Amino acid sequence: MAGVVLPASIQPQLLRPLAYRILTKKFGLNIKSDGLVALAAYIGTVFGLYWRQNSETTKFLEQFAIIWREQGRGLFVDELNVSQVINEIKEREKIEQDQHVEKRNNLHKANNLDAFLKRPNSPTDTEITTLSQGSATSVVNPDSHSPMMLEEGSPINSDSEPISEHERANGISNVDQQLDWLDYFKVIDAFNQQTFTYDHTKRQYIYVPRPKEVEKNMLSIAKLKLPNVESKVSLFTTRYHIIKDKVLRNEKFQNNDIFNPLSSIIEMGKHMNESDVSPLNSASYMKITQIKNLLGHDGKNFLLLGLLDQNSKGNWSLEDPSGSIELHLQQAIPTKGTYYVPGCIVLVEGIYYTASNTFVVSSITHPPGEKREDTIEAIGNLDLLGAYNPSNENYVARLDKDLKIRLHYLEQELSDNKFVILGGDIYLDEMTTMDGLKKTFDKLTTDPPVAIVFNGSFVSVPVHPSLNAKNVSATVSYKNNFDALATLLSNYENLINDTHMIFIPGPNDPWTSMVGLGTTTMWPQKIIPSSFTQKMSRICRKVHWGSNPLRIAYLSQEIVLTRDDLANRFKRYNIVFPTVEEEKYLENAELQEQYSRNPDVSVGQLIAFKNNLPVSVLESRKLVKTLLDQQHLSPFSSRIRPTVWDLDFTLQLSPLPSSIMLCDTSAPAFDVTYNGCKTINPGRFIHKRAAKYIEFFPASKVLVEEELPF
């Protein structure tokens, strides 16, 4: 598109034949009238009167179609998407032009003859540089009396630098050496994370720019973080459509026209858990029915997907965007190994009865999971976190596959990089905690990690307006605790200079503790106010006061850090199914009967013989599977765990992160990998006069549990 042209006004019907030949016949896109008008206006402005004879017009339309297909913008070319794609083409051309100018400037500086002659002597000055075939071979030595050869292809008058055979052989390693891993290490706060909304009609994410303040000194929604009503309306609808699209991508749901009522979702779960899955036949395909389509189909079997919650009568109901229906769970058989709580999105199979307008559930399960790579490919390789490049109004950043491969190789080279995750409830107001921290820092200072994660709460009593026996307010005492931690850290130069200190607040930390008093409050939770952390920020060079939850972009990986007692909340609100209770009763009766026949064998031995896995392992797997299948850090209804409406997207786990550091003090420490996502719980920091933490190596995803008695 180089050169100066006279703009022209092109009638859309004149452009239609060329656009139809390229966009429709070649790329399978359907052009709408407003989209054709936008294309004609741009082509007339850029290519002028001779746009027909200019081959760049065809190249532009082909580039337009390629970007359109890459971004998955659908089949219909409309005005809004045309303007977005054109803006992205402009942005790419601008970046390429800037890089080209910068490269030529650098080459001009490097190839300047005066600068070349003024270089000091070095071993490379006397090396013989072998150029490409057909170019001259010369010995460069400024101090020698031999004439200097300036042949075509030499490094002095060539536009490109020569590449030696050694560099060609090690091209990949040389490229990797140019990457600085610190440029791809980012700590992303939930309140500063870039916003994407999900458009279920186009099945793609839409970037939403942050609102700009009208005046600097005026309070605005951006400052107060007040959500709007639309965010509340779309809160669970967005979750529903994200999970539904994930379900429809599963091979069991590929055929929308066939559904065999005899192939229940329990059998589907068994097939999915098998290692060697036989080829799918048509009878195993399943179809999801909307609730509004149940009317008039009395006594028929259906499969529904919806939000599980209680209605105004206190009965269980299922809700989707088309409507809601009351559930009868007396005969429901749930799949084992998961929790069922109000707010979960579940698959239910059963029979609809028109008389009572109820749905008698025969089986219930969570949606099937999906691996991170599959989800990223399905959404068009979007960089939702902005880890590599931030998105803006004119450009939506995407994950570069080549860069991702290079970063992966760089991760393997940095195999010694490690993260230290301390256990939760680091009560700085207790002397035992300070002793444990001192013991931990003594060991870590010899080999400083990349980051140390401090999980709250950082005080044993919730911070609230009160005075203690010494007439010291709770806020002053809270600040003094962090000052004491800063004084302790000042003795470890390696840690305060080289290690990233990441602090994640807990339920007792301000300011949410003022309202919740240590109970469940709004999520995400804001960072600890700076008025309490001034000394820590002054002593530590790399300190991050993070929100809860928090995300880390480490090279090609995404790591989620969160502090929440999920195990207790899942157990408290888990639905009790009569069929499960009956099964437990029969199992206990069988154990008692076996014990009566053989009194020498204890009940514990009988249980261990039946199931060799410990209860703690089963519970941890149950928690992780529920969390990752729901693809949300808080799969509860709003009355159980309220969330900030317009920040619910920061709690989404779609796509699944590479690792989740879930600090849950109500559950024992565990390490569970599900669908390629490694979930780690360090447990409690102080346990029986011992400091517990975990060393995590992201390159190999290996963790080492440490326990330091003091």
Curated annotation (Swiss-Prot):
Pfam families: DNA_pol_E_B. One of its GO terms (biological process) is DNA-templated DNA replication. Residues 121-144 have a biased composition (Polar residues). The keyword DNA-binding applies. InterPro entries: DNA_pol_a/d/e_bsu, POLE2. Belongs to the DNA polymerase epsilon subunit B family. In eukaryotes there are five DNA polymerases: alpha, beta, gamma, delta, and epsilon which are responsible for different reactions of DNA synthesis. This is DNA polymerase epsilon subunit B. The lineage of its organism: Eukaryota, Fungi, Dikarya, Ascomycota, Saccharomycotina.
